[in-house]
């Protein structure tokens, strides 16, 4: 993300406290993308390679050290554009694994991310035969710029529009959703606000990584991490309440509407009957793993097919880098629980380098002794 784009995002954040919060999300991936340099490949001078694909391939090889996640050429990548219900034009991509496939993954990036991060996160599903749709949320990448950034409230309209676009143009039989951080929040938000819509559009499962369940808990986590001092609960609640009030004045939106916990615990909302695999790391600096656990527990009252994976050591949205073997294994086995195609899953795992020897050796974990993983049998 360029400095000009970064300043534009911060100007729209509203209250000054939100500017500080938003800035903390920007720092890491901006630095990572700027650190990658390129040289021309003389052997492939006649092959056009999208510069973003080239950059992301470098990141996957040099930083993630996962060549399995790279793309060779992008002949089967097509740009798309679609419009949201409030008139925002969204920029996206379709990756066509198989023109005859009716299985699709929609992958949703984190705050300050972009569609190419979403595409690379979805790479394991290509080995299962899924086509992929990715897009830039409003105020990100090549999508329209708007007056406000809301960390999920208005951005949820973008995912709704993506699902509608996919249904209208591709007639999928199965849609899976994959979300990271803000993208994960939005998926969870839609499960408690758009239940019939998700059922109608054949959304069958979702994966949620590093989600937050409310702006209140997100603020609490960020400020405890940044300010480095102890707040008692009373002080914590007052500070967050004051921030939200000033944010509502700045944006003219009710930010308490974004509290998913209230929908479960106070309003007794029943979520869409879509199983979710929840993933988080206990040492995440930006969102709390307790949010993910709390979402899982709230959903367990009505949904028995969810799974929960909590790493002791995994940074914000880094499970694919730090725990590649176990994360991809859990993703694909979770999908197979819903879709039931053992042969395809086995071949995909082998192609991605996840063989029995690695699985039996605790996924070759170097950071974990015992990872918390739960599913109901």
Regions found by a protein language model. Name each.
Residues 1-83, 93, 346-349, 367-377:
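An N-terminal hydrophobic leader/cap segment in hydrolases
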Residues 110-124, 290:
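The serine-hydrolase catalytic nucleophile loop
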Residues 140-174:
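Catalytic nucleophile-loop/oxyanion-hole region of alpha/beta-hydrolase
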């Amino acid at each position: 993300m360029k400095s000009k784009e970064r300043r534009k995002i911060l100007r729209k954040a509203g209250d000054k406290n939100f500017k500080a919060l938003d800035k903390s999300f920007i720092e890491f991936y901006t630095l990572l993308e700027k650190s990658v340099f390129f040289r021309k490949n003389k052997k492939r001078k006649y092959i056009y390679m999208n510069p973003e694909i080239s950059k992301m391939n470098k990141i996957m090889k040099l930083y993630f050290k996962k060549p399995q996640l790279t793309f060779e050429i992008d002949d089967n990548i097509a740009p798309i554009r679609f419009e949201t219900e409030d008139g925002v034009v969204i920029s996206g991509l379709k990756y066509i694994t198989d023109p005859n496939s009716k299985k699709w993954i929609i992958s949703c990036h984190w705050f300050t991310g972009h569609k190419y991060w979403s595409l690379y996160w979805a790479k394991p599903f290509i080995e299962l035969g899924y086509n992929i749709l990715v897009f830039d949320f409003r105020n990100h990448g090549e999508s329209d710029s708007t007056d406000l950034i809301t960390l999920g409230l208005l951005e949820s309209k973008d995912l709704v529009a993506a699902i509608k676009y996919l249904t209208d143009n591709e007639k999928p039989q199965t849609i899976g959703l994959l979300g990271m951080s803000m993208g994960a929040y939005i998926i969870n938000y839609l499960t408690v606000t758009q239940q019939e819509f998700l059922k109608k559009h054949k959304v069958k499962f979702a994966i949620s990584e590093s989600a937050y369940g409310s702006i209140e808990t997100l603020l609490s986590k960020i400020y405890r991490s940044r300010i480095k001092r102890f707040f008692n609960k009373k002080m914590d609640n007052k500070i967050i309440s004051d921030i939200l009030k000033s944010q509502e004045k700045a944006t003219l939106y009710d930010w308490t509407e974004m509290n998913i916990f209230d929908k479960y615990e106070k309003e007794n909302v029943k979520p869409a009957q879509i199983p979710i695999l929840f993933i988080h790391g206990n040492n995440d600096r930006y969102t709390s793993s307790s949010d993910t656990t709390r979402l899982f527990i709230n959903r367990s009252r009505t949904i028995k097919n969810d799974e929960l994976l909590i790493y002791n050591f995994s940074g914000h949205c880094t499970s694919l880098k730090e725990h590649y073997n176990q994360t991809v294994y859990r993703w694909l086995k979770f999908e197979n629980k819903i879709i039931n195609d053992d042969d395809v899953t086995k071949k995909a795992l082998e192609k991605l380098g996840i063989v029995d020897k690695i699985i039996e050796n605790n996924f070759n974990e170097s950071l974990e002794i015992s990872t918390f993983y739960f599913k109901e049998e």
